[in-house]
Each structure stands twice: as structure tokens, then as C-alpha cells.
């Protein structure tokens, strides 16, 4: 069995990313922010407090995103796939809001929060730094991404009890369900 088959490749690649972000943060006290951070580009983010508040409270209306926020707030941890989905949704994927409040939310709730790694990932996913070296040009559709990682909707139903009885074909986009289904 080679390293890729037993997971060694994945572990090593994640360690390399961690070290990359540690190196990039060295001697940069402003690494966890945009404005004074010399490696960040100036992105003209929107400033819509209502959208930020909905995101922070897991009430965006996008079940996979809301489940991720609620899991993080309840348990102090979320899978890296969910972290990336949340980061992309807040920034360049959907809301086009500054990544700094998302970074602060992660650091407040994630028990494994790491200043350099968390900041680095937010900069990467938001495309405010590292774009050429890390190629983060794709975007995730929050209604499709959940299907890819959890086709049965178990994750959403666990963290969004209001959707526990929603038929699986509508769990990631409940607004598409017929009215009689939504009223149940």
C-alpha cells in the first residue's frame, strides 16, 4: 500500500499547508487582517451588516452553510470541507463580505483555531492573497456542495432541526419544495 492509499499523502500535504501559512505569517503582525497586511490585495467587499449577522447565527437560508455555523458554535469543530464552504460563502462565493469577521468567528468557536493557519486559509479562499500560488479560482454552489458531501442530508438534518422532516430531495434547497411540503 502506498502513502496515498493509506492517507499519508493527505496528512503530509496538510502539514505542508500549515508550514506554508506559518512561514507567511512570520514577522507580519498584521497577518490576521486585510488593511495593514502587506500580502493582501485591496478587495472592495460589500458592507451589509444584516447578511453578516445572518451568517454568524446560521440563518442565511442555505441549509449546508447554516448547519456548518451551528455545528461550529455548538461543538467547537467542523470538517475542513465545511470550513472552506463557509469561507467561500461569506467572501467571494456568495455574500462578498470581508473575511475578517469570519476569521474572528472561527477563532472564537473552533477549539483548534490557529492564528496563522486560520488567517491563511481565509486569505486563500477569499482570493485576497495567495491567488497565483494556490489557484482558488473556483466557487462552490452552497445548494449543490452539500449534495456532494452528504447526499442523504443527515448533516443538515442533525444541525437544523427545523428541516429534520424535509424530504431529502429538498433538504439543500427547501424553497424549491412544494408549499404543502414546506408547511409540514
Feature map (PLM): residue ranges:
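C-terminal catalytic domain of photolyase/cryptochrome flavoproteins
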Residues: 1-184
Amino acid at each position: 500500500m502506498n502513502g496515498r492509499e493509506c492517507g499519508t499523502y493527505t496528512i503530509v500535504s496538510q502539514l505542508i499547508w500549515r508550514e506554508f501559512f506559518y512561514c507567511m505569517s512570520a514577522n507580519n503582525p498584521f497577518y490576521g487582517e486585510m488593511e495593514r497586511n502587506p500580502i493582501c490585495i485591496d478587495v472592495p467587499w460589500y458592507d451589509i451588516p444584516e447578511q453578516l449577522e445572518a451568517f454568524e447565527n446560521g440563518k442565511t437560508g442555505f441549509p449546508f452553510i447554516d448547519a456548518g455555523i451551528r455545528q461550529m458554535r455548538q461543538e467547537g469543530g467542523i470538517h475542513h470541507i465545511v470550513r472552506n464552504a463557509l469561507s467561500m460563502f461569506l467572501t467571494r462565493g456568495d455574500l462578498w463580505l470581508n473575511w475578517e469577521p469570519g476569521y474572528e468567528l472561527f477563532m472564537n468557536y473552533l477549539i483548534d483555531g490557529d492564528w496563522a493557519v486560520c488567517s491563511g486559509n481565509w486569505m486563500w479562499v477569499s482570493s485576497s492573497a495567495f491567488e497565483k500560488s494556490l489557484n482558488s479560482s473556483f466557487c462552490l454552489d452552497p445548494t449543490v456542495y452539500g449534495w456532494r458531501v452528504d447526499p442523504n442530508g443527515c448533516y443538515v438534518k442533525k444541525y437544523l432541526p427545523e428541516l429534520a422532516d424535509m424530504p431529502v430531495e429538498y433538504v439543500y434547497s427547501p424553497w424549491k419544495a412544494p408549499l404543502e411540503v414546506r408547511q409540514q
